[in-house]
Amino acid sequence: MAIDYSLGASIMLQLGPFQFGVTTAAYQSLRRSSEYRWPAQERFNNHAALQYVGPGTESITLSGVVYPEWRGGIHVIDDLRDLASQGLPQLMIDGRGNLLGRWVIERVEEAQSVFADAGVPRKQEFTLQLRRYHGDEDVA
């Protein structure tokens, strides 16, 4: 994977070495989901009691469009696939510099349309499914 992006460019989000932005892959939608675990504890002759046992799964879904002839190039979504295939959690930082923790790429979806010569797509829509990674060192 040869990711070479310019410094000083407007970055929306960075996942490991990959920078989301107008010059690479701009996402139009970011959906974040946070779960909290409340298992039911059965009680005799009474309603079940809920007990908070801690945070659950966090996930992010990014959806966007790449126009390879305009910005980013035809390789951008393949760069995301290469990053996912490394099998390593990636550090995520938002465009304001906030550290969002380590995340793994669970799925990369791509839809190609508006084709040029040799079947090269002029439009690539993508959806990226991420899940927050918590290693053993994160357990308190």
Regions found by a protein language model. Give the residues of each.
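Compositionally biased, intrinsically disordered low-complexity segments enriched in polar/Pro/Gly
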Residues: M1-A140
